[in-house]
Amino acid sequence: RRQRQMCIRDRFRLATVQDFSAVTAACLLVRTAVYDELHGLDEEFTVAYNDVDFCLRVRDAGWRIVWTPYAELYHYESKSRGSDENDPAKKARFDAEHERLYAVHGRENILHDPYYSPSLSLDYEDFRESGDLRNLK
């Protein structure tokens, strides 16, 4: 049922090769020269957002972040290290890295993703419409 709901809501977006602002480092393919030029993943993002930061730097350097439906993997987020929500120290680290991402790349740049429709909700992961269409410009 969830898969059917996703297909209806995303209008088959996930079946299309397309540009994204960032993808997960769990499945990231990048030219060595680009990785080296940008000095790889920023180790100051010890757990969270190192992939997002890297992708944003790749994009700022003039390269594209391309997502393809033809690569398939299973990624169990936080499976090996556990949830950040249940551990106050992990939660604090996550929150600090979140704020650092805003500081490095600008809050507005993060919140106004050029590859994500402003008519879609940021509160859900299933491409449902935003309840506040005033955000459209």
Predicted features along the sequence, with ranges:
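Short, small-residue-biased leader/transition segments that mark boundaries at the very start
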Residues: 3-8
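Glycine-centered small-residue hotspots that permit tight backbone geometry or close packing
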Residues: 1, 40, 77-80
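A short, conserved alpha-helix in the catalytic core of glycosyltransferases
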Residues: 12-39, 44-74
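Active-site-adjacent helix/loop segment of glycosyltransferases
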Residues: 59-137
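Short amphipathic alpha-helical surface micro-motifs
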Residues: 9-12, 83-84
